[in-house]
């Protein structure tokens, strides 16, 4: 806990709405010696709910969010935001969209030729549904932490992850939720490596059904592989 205290645990949990609480407690988090800035929306400072198109090829950030909703009066959904990370841009967390209270829908993260930190997430919510979010990792990219297509609470549905010619050092969860996880899909292609496990759907309290994992020739998953876990 000394490490967590030094890294300002409360501040970090607020930033990501509890999404990484388990990782923090497990001591997975690796932070730079100095806190970098967060990046929100098109201009880096606007917590917009929809329509963000963020493209970064340089700079050092603690977290990058396309869409972001952190109040109860936000729209019911944070939706249709896009984040693309290329070049030398460095960040611990990349999220197409995050909402503390509402749904996250149809958000996309693309990582191309880059090495990133702890979490890549198409869409994450602290209270509702994650629906039709997308993560694309390609072109010799490396993610040192976990990949989520959609991380919901009540449900996680129709999210997808595509990994090609890249390395993921932790687990891939295409759809994760306390409630039902349905119709999520991951494709691992073109000599990619996942050093832990791959789950199409992962439900803590509900059902997990109609989720798919496709691993093509030349790719390797070191840990467990399951279409759905409940």
Question: What kind of feature is each model-predicted range?
Answer:
Residues 10, 31-37:
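Sec/Tat signal peptide C-region and signal peptidase I cleavage site
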Residues 21-30:
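Bacterial N-terminal signal peptides
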Residues 1-22:
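Bacterial Sec-dependent N-terminal signal peptides
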Residues 37-63, 68-93, 99-118, 125-146, ...:
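Surface-exposed loop/turn motifs in large extracellular/passenger domains
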């Amino acid at each position: 806990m000394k490490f967590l205290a030094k890294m300002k645990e409360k501040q970090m949990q607020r930033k990501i709405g509890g999404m990484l609480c388990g990782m923090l407690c497990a001591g997975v988090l690796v932070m730079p010696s100095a806190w970098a800035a967060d990046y929100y929306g098109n201009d880096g400072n606007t917590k917009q709910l929809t329509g963000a198109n963020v493209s970064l090829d340089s700079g050092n950030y603690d977290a990058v969010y396309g869409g972001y909703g952190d109040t109860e009066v936000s729209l019911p959904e944070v939706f249709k935001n896009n984040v693309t990370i290329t070049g030398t841009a460095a960040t611990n967390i990349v999220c197409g969209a995050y909402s503390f209270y509402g749904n996250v829908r149809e958000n996309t993260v693309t990582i191309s030729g880059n090495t990133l930190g702890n979490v890549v997430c198409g869409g994450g919510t602290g209270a509702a549904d994650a629906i039709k979010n997308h993560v694309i990792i390609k072109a010799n990219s490396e993610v040192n932490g976990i990949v989520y297509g959609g991380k919901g609470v009540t449900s996680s549905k129709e999210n997808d992850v595509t990994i090609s010619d890249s390395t993921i050092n932790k687990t891939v969860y295409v759809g994760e939720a306390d409630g039902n996880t349905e119709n999520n899909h991951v494709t691992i292609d073109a000599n990619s490596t996942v050093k832990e496990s791959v789950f199409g759907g992962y439900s803590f309290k509900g059902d997990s059904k109609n989720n798919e994992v496709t691993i093509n020739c030349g790719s390797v998953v070191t840990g467990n592989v399951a279409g759905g876990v409940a």
